[in-house]
């Protein structure tokens, strides 16, 4: 939705670090968030004007900026916004140079500046990358299978777990739908696939999903964080997945303590007789119950 958001995105240069910052104060649920782009090289030029970067009728395959010695330094409001940095590096024959570009988003300006500072420099970036490698080696190595079919081994030993965690749990994305919502049924299914690799994530998803149950027992079929807007529907198989996921978790880990965790209920109007569903932001009920009681209800 670049065209609809472009008029409200304001860009600036952070005076302390020189990083480029961008925010959209009209994004109701994310108005405090600040995106940033930084580089380990201090000698750089930049622009936050997409028209300048690409050129009129230009493309990402052949942007106009590649023909320019420097970018203008244009920032502010009223642009077709982007974050672009240009760094010139001269290399002698056989010489190499490491550059680090950091691109991310903070919860607010203070958080963005903290992240910029944390990942400044090649050393910090290498340490972060080593941490990422260690995490994935540990997580993807939790389960190992060997079958007569090499292609199945390739999928099962790493790739499917990676896809489930990165795409389904973190990105809430799929081949046919990339909406970013939590699905009551879908993410419980996904989290169960991680019971051996990331059991804490399954436990967290059980408690999170229980908190999206209405007092009457039905649930939000899907919802968007952080506010929790979503749909209340007549879909009936949602009822099955919370007790099934709890049974899978307790059976695999013998952690019966999850049954005593407490989660709130939601309050909202019932689905009308002539409706299949409706989209709304429900209220948080003052009533809470244990995970076991949520499963029973």
Which residues make up each language-model segment?
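Solvent-exposed loop and edge beta-strand segments that line ligand/cofactor-binding
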Residues: 173-187, 227-237
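Beta-strand-rich interaction surfaces with strong enrichment in secreted/lumenal proteins
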Residues: 72-76, 86-91
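Aromatic-rich carbohydrate-recognition surfaces in CAZymes
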Residues: 194-202, 206-297
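Polysaccharide-binding surfaces and accessory modules of carbohydrate-active proteins
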Residues: 1-68, 85, 110-142, 269-273, ...
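Low-complexity, Ser/Thr/Pro/Gly-enriched N-terminal "stalk/linker" regions
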Residues: 130-177, 204, 208
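Short Pro-Gly-centered flexible turn/kink motifs
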Residues: 89-107
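Active-site-adjacent bridging/hinge elements
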Residues: 69-79, 158-172, 209-223
């Amino acid at each position: 939705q670049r065209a609809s958001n472009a008029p409200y995105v304001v860009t600036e240069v952070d005076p302390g670090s020189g990083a480029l910052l961008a925010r959209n104060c009209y994004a109701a649920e994310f108005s405090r968030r600040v995106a940033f782009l930084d580089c380990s090289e201090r000698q750089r030029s930049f622009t936050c004007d997409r028209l300048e970067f690409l050129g009129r009728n230009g493309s990402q395959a052949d942007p106009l900026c590649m023909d320019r010695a420097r970018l203008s330094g244009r920032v502010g409001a009223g642009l077709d916004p982007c974050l672009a940095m240009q760094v010139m590096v001269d290399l002698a024959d056989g010489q190499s140079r490491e550059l680090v570009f950091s691109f991310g988003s903070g919860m607010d300006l203070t958080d963005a500046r903290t992240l910029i500072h944390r990942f400044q420099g090649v050393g910090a970036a290498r340490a972060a990358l080593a941490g990422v490698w260690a995490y994935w080696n540990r997580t993807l190595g939790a389960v190992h299978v060997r079958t007569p079919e090499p292609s199945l081994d390739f999928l099962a030993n790493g790739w499917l777990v990676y896809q489930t965690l990165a795409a389904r749990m973190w990105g809430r994305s799929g081949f046919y739908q990339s909406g970013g919502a939590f699905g009551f049924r879908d993410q419980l299914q996904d989290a169960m696939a991680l019971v051996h690799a990331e059991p804490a994530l399954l436990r967290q998803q059980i408690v999170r999903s229980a908190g999206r149950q209405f007092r009457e027992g039905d649930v939000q079929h899907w919802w968007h964080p952080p506010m929790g807007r979503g749909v209340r529907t007549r879909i009936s198989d949602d009822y099955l997945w919370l007790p099934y996921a709890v049974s899978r978790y307790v059976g695999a880990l013998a952690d019966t303590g999850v049954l005593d965790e407490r989660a709130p209920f939601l309050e909202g109007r019932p689905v009308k007789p002539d409706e299949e569903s409706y989209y709304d932001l429900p209220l948080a009920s003052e009533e809470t119950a244990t995970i076991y009681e949520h499963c029973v209800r």
